[in-house]
A protein has these predicted regions:
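Conserved, mostly hydrophobic/aromatic
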Residues: 21, 40, 48, 77, ...
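Aromatic-lined substrate-binding rim segments of carbohydrate-active enzymes
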Residues: 35-41, 49-113, 141, 241-248, ...
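The substrate-binding groove and active-site-proximal loops of carbohydrate-active enzymes
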Residues: 18-29, 53-68, 115-134, 159-163, ...
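Polysaccharide-binding and catalytic clefts of secreted carbohydrate-active enzymes
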Residues: 110, 114-276, 280-294
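N-terminal carbohydrate-binding accessory modules
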Residues: 1-49, 60, 75-79, 83, ...
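Short, well-ordered coil/turn segments that N-cap beta-strands
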Residues: 14-17, 44-46, 78-84, 146-151, ...
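Short, acidic/polar
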Residues: 27-42, 133-139, 259-270, 330-338
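Carbohydrate-binding surfaces of carbohydrate-active enzymes
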Residues: 205-208, 260, 271, 279-711
Length: 711
């Protein structure tokens, strides 16, 4: 994957894989701080994030600052060798600011103000909020910008987690300004929005409000523009702090912590404004295959900055506190989930939080140091993990090797998930993206993320589960990739509308018509509880939710056909040779086994391997530098797995090789019956992990269940 074109990002000032978590010393008396330092050293903690929610403590009255306690704890951390991910403390406003300016409080779509008492109680468009955010950030930067422990700046916290959209009067003013910048004049807006439907023509900018609750369906282009505007409004808020920090501390890296695959903010835009991508990841312990979705999240995180390492800035040591049922993590789960993030390109394992709270909304959220103190299971397991990470220092700075990318396009996500005016509410963008990635995971591949316009350098296969909104530029980029020998697979309901939600001339697939060699006559949603069947490769696969009546153009091969229902006998899956590559179209929502079958064939056409036998709990990801491949092999399941791995590989965790004796952490490492010097068998016990170092090869090692292997 190519680097981002924004120049060389500033480096985080820490010379190790970062390990630690959020730290809230202002929730504890100072006599606890010394104990924290002792236990942090014992656990191997080398970085903490603070003071994320401490604005009220730092500025208890307007213009009156109390820096003394923060001075003391920052110095104490530095004295103990712990780097500081220093937050700007702008995650939530102090009560005095809200009471002085109640117009700052956000408003929901029903016109109700959200009150003080939780967090993120602000309208992102509020001029007062923006002015105060800039002021507080400058105060923090001027006081601590030269602190020797400062590793990077942490701006705000989880933008949009509670308030990603605001419908208040100040948001309306900002929305109008955004629309004026986009369309120039009312004629441009009226044309883009298609206002002749239902008599919605605007004759004054002041007539345009945020899309509050209305008697019926709201104009879908207005809704789409409000999604874009809301993401941009939050980005502007972020950029205000970035600009202040660039001015005062130009050499210090800046970040804001993302929330994995988060619908409400276009992270491509946010990542371009920061130095390093950071993520808060909370796979559900109650979901036995949550690691599969996590892999897609992490693929996005590493891709947002062109493949550069990212940082896992928050995760849970066990249970969270915000699900309906907060299931704890089983013993060993902390380790395998944390090392999965490292496998996928993270140069950090951080938790929320260091010491478990005694009060407040998160007192039942697990932490590194649980309520029982150093005897707690979470502390013992995270301490062991901290020491284990030191054995993996060689992987720091390396990059994940992937030959496959999945198109992540926020416009299509927003447009295809509007609550009304679509053929079906069941065709969920995120659910389809996760299903396609899950199939590729089963077949043995880690998947990057990419924009629909690329760059596609280094990839053999690009999959686009849905590109509802598509333009000629995207089509040209994908066509050039295929012409040069790439394989692209595009999913249903793609190429339907342009960026103003107007249906393309001639219908779907719009700009992809020539590339795919098909035309969609009609979308054909499947009613709840029903499923069509699709015949593919001699097997029948269920197709719930969605189908399409398509016509193939000359030169297009029918790979699979509908086998039941009203579409029986019509094409369902097609491919077309274009230049040196091929373009596939999947017109239906296939069951998991159907997707595996189709994508297995697409992989073969792209010259990529695929596992013959699949196990959803097996994962293998390779990070590499110029000389060495570091292949992480993970068993996310509760029963042992035996896999085929390169013979003579050095396990960074155990220090052994594939010819060594059994090791209790991983089970047996024994030679297989394969030809000498080729492959060995490795048994991974429950939640087992191996990190195998081998000389860098032209292709990353492809790990399969034993005795299966590729020649």
């Amino acid at each position: 994957m190519a680097d981002t074109p924004t120049g060389t990002p500033r480096a985080v000032r820490i010379d190790a894989l970062a390990f630690g978590g959020d730290y809230n010393p202002d929730q504890w008396s100072e006599d606890v701080w010394a104990e924290d330092m002792r236990l942090m050293r014992e656990a191997g903690v080398n970085m903490v994030s603070l003071p994320i929610f401490s604005w009220p403590q730092l500025e208890p009255e307007p213009g009156v600052y109390d820096w003394a306690w923060l001075d003391r704890i920052l110095d104490l951390l530095h004295e103990n060798g712990i780097a500081i991910d220093l937050a700007t403390a702008t995650a939530t406003p102090p009560s005095w600011l809200l009471r002085a300016h109640p117009e700052m409080m956000p408003m929901d779509a029903d016109g109700h103000r959200l009150e003080f008492g939780s967090r993120q109680v602000y309208c992102p468009s509020s001029p007062v909020w923006r002015e105060n955010v800039a002021r507080m950030t400058r105060a923090m930067a001027e006081r601590y910008g030269e602190h020797p422990g400062l590793a990077m700046w942490h701006i705000s916290n989880e933008y949009g987690d509670h308030v990603s959209r605001c419908w208040c009067p100040e948001s309306a003013v900002h929305f109008r300004r955004w629309l004026q910048d986009r369309y120039g004049d009312l004629d441009g807006l009226n044309e883009a929005w298609g206002v002749n439907v239902w008599g919605q023509r605007y004759t004054s900018w002041d007539h345009i409000e945020t899309p509050k609750k209305a008697p019926g369906p709201i104009n879908p282009t207005k809704l789409l523009d409000f999604e874009r505007f809301s993401s941009d409004a939050m980005l502007e808020l972020f950029q205000i702090e970035v600009d202040v920090l660039r001015e005062v501390t130009p050499d210090i890296a800046v970040t804001t912590n993302f929330m994995s695959m988060f619908r409400d903010l276009d992270y491509w835009d946010f990542a371009a404004a920061e130095d390093v991508v950071t993520d808060d990841a909370y796979p559900d312990p109650a979901d036995p295959i949550s690691h599969v979705g996590a892999a897609l999240n992490y693929g996005l995180m590493r891709s947002l900055k062109g493949g550069r390492p990212w940082l896992l800035l928050e995760s849970s040591a066990s249970a969270t506190s915000w699900r309906d049922i907060n299931v704890p993590k089983a013993p060993g789960k902390i380790r395998v989930e944390s090392l999965q993030a490292v496998a996928h390109g993270s140069d950090a394992v951080m938790f929320f939080q260091w010491r478990q709270a005694k009060y407040g909304q998160e007192k039942f959220h697990s932490s590194m140091l649980g309520h029982r103190g150093e005897s707690s299971r979470s502390f013992q397991e995270t301490k062991a993990l901290g020491h284990e990470l030191k054995r993996l220092e060689a992987v720091r700075g390396t990059r994940v090797r992937s030959r496959i990318a999945l198109v992540v396009d926020w416009d299509s996500w927003w447009g295809s998930s509007a609550t009304e005016s679509l053929p079906s509410q069941r065709l969920n963008w995120a659910r389809q993206a996760r299903a396609w990635q899950r199939a590729l995971h089963l077949l043995g591949h880690a998947v990057d993320a990419v924009k629909a316009t690329g760059p596609f350098d280094g990839y053999d296969l690009v999959v686009a589960p849905n590109l509802y909104i598509a333009d000629a530029g995207q089509a040209a980029a994908l066509a050039a990739f295929v012409q040069a020998g790439g394989t692209v697979v595009i999913g249903p309901f793609s190429g339907v509308v342009d960026d103003t939600e107007k249906v393309h001339e001639g219908g779907a697939p719009g700009p992809f018509r020539e590339l795919l060699g098909i035309e969609v006559d009609e979308q054909w949603p499947v009613d709840d509880g029903l499923a069509e069947t699709v015949a593919y490769g001699g097997h029948a696969y269920d197709s719930p939710i969605w189908g399409e009546w398509i016509e193939v153009l000359p030169g297009t091969e029918i790979r699979g056909s509908y086998a039941s229902g009203e579409l029986a006998g019509l094409p369902a899956v097609t491919s077309r040779a274009v230049g040196a590559g091929s373009a596939w179209y999947v017109s239906c929502v296939l069951s998991d086994d159907g997707l595996v079958a189709v994508l297995r064939d697409a992989l073969a056409g792209a010259g990529l391997p695929a596992r013959l036998r699949v196990d959803i709990h097996l994962e293998a990801v390779t990070r590499s530098d110029a000389d060495t491949d570091y292949t992480f092999v993970l068993n996310h399941g509760r029963t042992p797995l035996t896999v085929a791995v390169p013979d003579g590989a050095h396990d960074l965790i155990t220090g052994g090789t594939t010819a060594s004796s059994p090791h209790p952490l991983h089970g047996s490492l024994a030679r297989s019956a394969e030809p000498p010097g080729a492959w060995a068998h490795l048994t991974l016990e429950r939640f087992g992990v191996a990190v195998l170092a081998t000389p860098r090869a032209e292709s990353a090692p492809f790990i399969t269940l034993a005795p299966e292997r590729l020649p």
